[in-house]
Amino acid sequence: MDIREILKVLPHRYPFLLVDRVLEADERRFKALKNVTFNEPHFQGHFPGHPVMPGVLILEAMAQAAVGALVRQPGFPQGGLAFLAGVEGARFRRPVYPGDTLILEGELLAFRRGVGKVAVRALVEGEERASATLTFVLQGAS
């Protein structure tokens, strides 16, 4: 999925759109890319002189990437939304810096009755920087 296709399935927009490209996605697995740049507004205050991507934004990028698999589920309504409902076992192993290419990859663990659970990892140059299990609730289009 390129950015045009991503904009069709994610409601997020600047400065909160945190996925630049979905590299691979099927009903079970996904892999997406986020180019981390110093031009992003959070780097002005997190932290001056030592910019580090906030962990909560790494989690948000992971959640946005997971939608690549969720929208392919038979029960996902066209125009529907996936809301983050839970975060389990979040771990932040190393910082993410401006200039890094963040690879967000994961696997759908379960999907039933409009609720999905996904295991996600965030990597830079093959090294895991963060991981979590995320739960989503799907809401149909109105």
Curated annotation (Swiss-Prot):
Per its record, the protein catalyses: a (3R)-hydroxyacyl-[ACP] = a (2E)-enoyl-[ACP] + H2O
User: Which molecular function terms from Gene Ontology are attached?
Assistant: (3R)-hydroxyacyl-[acyl-carrier-protein] dehydratase activity
Which coarse location class describes where this protein primarily resides? cytoplasm
**What subcellular locations does the record give?**
Cytoplasm
Which stretch is the leader sequence?
Answer: none
Keyword Lipid biosynthesis on this protein? yes
Domain of life, per UniProt, equals: Bacteria
Membrane-crossing residue ranges in chain numbering:
none
> Quick one: a GO cellular component term?
membrane
InterPro entries this protein is in?
FabA_FabZ, FabZ, HotDog_dom_sf
Provide the function of this protein.
Involved in unsaturated fatty acids biosynthesis. Catalyzes the dehydration of short chain beta-hydroxyacyl-ACPs and long chain saturated and unsaturated beta-hydroxyacyl-ACPs.
The record's section on PANTHER family has: 3-HYDROXYACYL-[ACYL-CARRIER-PROTEIN] DEHYDRATASE
This chain's protein is named: 3-hydroxyacyl-[acyl-carrier-protein] dehydratase FabZ
Q: Which organism is it from?
A: Thermus thermophilus (strain ATCC 27634 / DSM 579 / HB8)
Gene behind the chain: fabZ
